[in-house]
From Swiss-Prot:
The gene is aat. It comes from the Bacteria. The lineage of its organism: Bacteria, Pseudomonadati, Pseudomonadota, Betaproteobacteria, Burkholderiales. Its EC number is 2.3.2.6. This is Leucyl/phenylalanyl-tRNA--protein transferase. One of its GO terms (cellular component) is cytoplasm. It is found in: Cytoplasm. It is an enzyme of class 2 (transferase). It holds the Pfam family Leu_Phe_trans. It catalyses: N-terminal L-lysyl-[protein] + L-leucyl-tRNA(Leu) = N-terminal L-leucyl-L-lysyl-[protein] + tRNA(Leu) + H(+); N-terminal L-arginyl-[protein] + L-leucyl-tRNA(Leu) = N-terminal L-leucyl-L-arginyl-[protein] + tRNA(Leu) + H(+); L-phenylalanyl-tRNA(Phe) + an N-terminal L-alpha-aminoacyl-[protein] = an N-terminal L-phenylalanyl-L-alpha-aminoacyl-[protein] + tRNA(Phe).
């Protein structure tokens, strides 16, 4: 039995989340409240929302937790060449926070294998849009010939980044945005990106599962650090990244 949260109720301890033998491992609580204040409270405790249209807001704390250290992003020799070409070619641009809400809508509308519909509801877009307006959520966007062709968004608290979703309308467009994000976060001492749930795709990018207790220790430390400001794309940071040896494939 999970907890039902009224607007002023605290979250229960994450250890009460449903276990691996249940139909919904990691499910902790449900509510109608999806205010920016509730979201911030959740992220600072390693909790995230994930639900479908017609459901209450479902709150999760998975164990293990999938995370990506910025320096662990797997960059093949082929993709490294792609990044170098993108950095040289004026047809390509990488932008930060050009249109956060447009990125969210693109993530919501992009079909995904094995998913029917989207969890990025109008309420989700409004809540994260409010965080963005307060400098606590950001988008990294890949543009080609004046059109946004890929991107991602997430929440930034202190030196912790919580990845939410990404999309691509052109080959490698979302991965280009992810590489730019990792280069930026790595240059600011961010130890990890929260990827939430374990998937083969995330593992192929270099993400790995860690125990929830270890993840929460990272969250407490990193989120208490000063926030990164300003958020902007520095081409030279990604150029230095592409100059390092290619990550061996595993």
């Amino acid at each position: 039995m999970i907890a039902w949260l009224d607007p002023h109720d605290p979250f229960p301890p994450v250890e009460r989340a449903l276990g691996p033998a249940t139909e919904a491992p990691g499910l902790l609580a449900a509510s109608r409240d999806l205010s920016p204040q509730r979201l911030l409270l959740a992220y600072r405790q390693g909790i995230f929302p994930w639900y479908s249209v017609g459901q209450p807001v479902l709150w999760w704390s998975t164990d293990p937790r999938m995370v990506l250290a910025p320096q662990a992003l797997k960059i093949s020799a082929t993709f490294r060449k792609t990044l170098r070409r993108v950095l040289r070619d004026p047809d390509w641009e990488i932008r930060v926070d050009d249109d956060f809400l447009a990125v969210m809508r693109a993530c919501a509308m992009t079909p995904r294998e094995g998913q029917d519909g989207t969890w990025i509801t109008r309420e989700i877009i409004a809540a994260y849009g409010a965080l963005h307006s307060n400098g606590m959520a950001h988008s990294v966007e890949t543009w080609y010939r004046g059109t946004r062709v890929g991107g991602l968004y997430g929440v930034a608290l202190g030196r912790m980044f919580y990845g939410e979703s990404m999309f691509a309308h052109r080959t490698d467009a979302s991965k280009i945005a992810l590489a730019a994000l990792c280069a930026f976060l790595g240059s600011h001492g961010v130890p990890m990106i929260d990827c939430q749930q374990e998937t083969d795709h995330l593992a192929s990018l270099g993400a790995r599962p860690i125990a929830r207790a270890e993840f929460l220790a990272h969250v407490r430390n990193a989120s208490a650090q000063p926030a990164i400001t300003p958020w902007w794309f520095d081409k030279s940071v990604l150029e230095r990244w592409t100059a390092t040896p290619a990550t061996p494939a595993v």
